């Protein structure tokens, strides 16, 4: 019986085909990995993780984790959409210092081309600050993202988040309130996508699951 199972598993793997996973145009449509499937429809909805370093080759960006979701398969290529990003926990821990303050803001935003996202931004001060100063810094975060994001397409927003432009502007403004050591867009998540019928949840489900 165990031998039969062994051969069954082996035969199942023989039926599988490998597909190249393609990053969205904002990341140059490069191949970010490969994934197997015995039916291309089973790939739809699968989430792939990589780092910004794997895309750019810049070792200083190894802490930026990127998530892409497969939305289509064409021949041997799995086409993806940006799902979100997150900075590694080890990197965030390395930024935290004793006798300093951490300010966090979570904001829901909508891009110029109709994509809804949730952004988590953190600011780390050089020294411990007062509650009123924390509130003022959080307000600067909110005012900036609410002012800036509606001017950007999704691709432009992704670029400003992961390459540090957004955090640099917030840090510059926040330093007028209190000495700031670091600002990071710690996390982003795609919530809604635009469709002809209006915004819809950014949920990707395989047609095979829909048919069950």
Swiss-Prot record:
Pfam families with a match to the protein in the record? Ribosomal_S3Ae
What SMART domains would the database entry show?
Answer: Ribosomal_S3Ae
InterPro entries xrefs = Ribosomal_eS1, Ribosomal_eS1_arc, Ribosomal_eS1_CS
Question: What GO biological process terms does the UniProt entry carry, in alphabetical order?
Answer: translation
Concerning its family, UniProt says: Belongs to the eukaryotic ribosomal protein eS1 family.
Q: Which UniProt keywords apply?
A: Ribonucleoprotein, Ribosomal protein
MF-aspect GO terms: structural constituent of ribosome
Q: What is the name listed in the Swiss-Prot or TrEMBL entry for this protein?
A: Small ribosomal subunit protein eS1
Q: Which GO terms describe its cellular component?
A: ribonucleoprotein complex; ribosome
The record's listing under HAMAP family reads:
Ribosomal_eS1
């Amino acid at each position: 019986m165990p031998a039969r199972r062994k051969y069954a598993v082996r035969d199942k793997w023989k039926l599988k085909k490998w597909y190249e996973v393609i990053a969205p145009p904002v990341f140059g449509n490069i191949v970010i990995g490969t994934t197997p499937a015995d039916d291309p429809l089973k790939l739809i909805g699968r989430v792939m993780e990589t780092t910004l370093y794997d895309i750019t080759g810049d070792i200083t960006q190894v802490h930026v984790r990127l998530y892409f979701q497969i939305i289509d398969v064409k021949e041997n290529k799995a086409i993806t959409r940006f799902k979100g990003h997150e900075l590694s926990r080890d990197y965030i821990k390395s930024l935290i210092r004793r006798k300093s303050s951490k300010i966090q803001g979570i904001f829901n935003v909508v891009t110029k081309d109709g994509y809804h996202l949730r952004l988590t931004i953190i600011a780390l001060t050089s020294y411990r600050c007062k509650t009123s100063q924390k509130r003022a810094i959080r307000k600067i975060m909110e005012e900036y993202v609410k002012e800036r994001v509606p001017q950007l397409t999704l691709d432009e927003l992704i670029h400003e988040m992961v390459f540090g432009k957004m955090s640099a502007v917030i840090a510059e403004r926040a330093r007028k309130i209190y000495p700031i050591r670091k600002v990071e867009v710690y996390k982003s998540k795609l919530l809604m996508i635009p469709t002809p019928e209006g915004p819809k949840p950014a949920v990707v489900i395989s047609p095979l699951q829909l048919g069950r």
